[in-house]
């Protein structure tokens, strides 16, 4: 689509909206930005765009602007079913996401990665493998830099790796990755979607425009993911920790085996720095994606062995008096916490809770009963979590994260583990999951110094 002199409305002025507005203005479009927040709340953001010719409609959405736009670009934080967007679609206005817009201007081969959990680790590792194998690579999307920033820069890269949330996938039309990865599907964002199926359908849009020339990497150990296989137009490339595969990538007895069209590569996992059962899935997805896109096996293996993982994902903070403290603030849904609990056999003190996302906590029940010695609950969700899990183990409530850490310190015996994996978002008590993580680390370290 030619952007020059087109009337384009950008809905939402967070990080992605800023990047989109900047790109469109520089491309010569007539840009209007609308956001329900008032000007005072957006002062810093507006300063970033002050040198560009942009019209702002703040504190409200003006229906006329939605109806007159040649194109509407919606930021991921804005639900697609708000009334102005529904009205615009009913009048045949074109409504897309930032990822869709960016894809029109990016020609490099692309790996796109989605799933409820593990996206960021898999995306980062995939990018690291490409770079180690000599491919200049852009890594972005839901992690770090919006994809539109690559389009704006004009930088020529050999590979693109993009992490995609369900929100970003809602607004795709022609977006088509060469390799699309679906890691897993568990209940999440039910505070945004009307049903679990609606959330699943958003995830599956990653495959919508693929053809037989493309690959779909599916974790077939997840029944909801495996059920998608029959709907694919792309070539299925399965991954599994539970089954050996003649075609695909699988794990057995300490080795990952990649098999594709008669080519077989085996990778021993003993030297991997990235620990945890769930990370085997992330590693297999990263290896599959990069090896399918012409990375050298030895080079890819060395990159995996040197990868230490990311902050806020099962990060060992300290070992104090024989107790290991793990920070897993990115564990914002039940499925993620299940994976984290599976990494330990027993003796866990679990700190959980935060802003409730509307899903069921029942999938945690078997692991809480069998592996969690003490459960400490915080935040808005603690009443619901108490009801679902409180009778299964020794359970306590705390008013602050610092109090929760102190309770955990008192209860956990040497040789045990304190795991902070909330199963909830952070917005009831913190600005974001990063701030929540730093508060946990500070509380743990304060105890080490005898300050708590």
From Swiss-Prot:
Its job: Cell wall formation. Catalyzes the addition of glutamate to the nucleotide precursor UDP-N-acetylmuramoyl-L-alanine (UMA).
Annotated pathway: Cell wall biogenesis; peptidoglycan biosynthesis
Gene Ontology CC entries for this record: cytoplasm
Cell division listed as a keyword: yes
Listed GO biological process terms: cell division; cell wall organization; peptidoglycan biosynthetic process; regulation of cell shape
Reactions catalysed: UDP-N-acetyl-alpha-D-muramoyl-L-alanine + D-glutamate + ATP = UDP-N-acetyl-alpha-D-muramoyl-L-alanyl-D-glutamate + ADP + phosphate + H(+)
Residues the entry annotates as binding ATP: 115-121
Swiss-Prot/TrEMBL keywords: ATP-binding, Cell cycle, Cell division, Cell shape, Cell wall biogenesis/degradation, Cytoplasm, Ligase, Nucleotide-binding, Peptidoglycan synthesis
Claim: Translocase is one of the keywords in the record: no
GO MF annotations in UniProt: ATP binding; UDP-N-acetylmuramoylalanine-D-glutamate ligase activity
Enzyme Commission designation: 6.3.2.9
Family note: Belongs to the MurCDEF family.
Gene: murD
Record protein name field: UDP-N-acetylmuramoylalanine--D-glutamate ligase
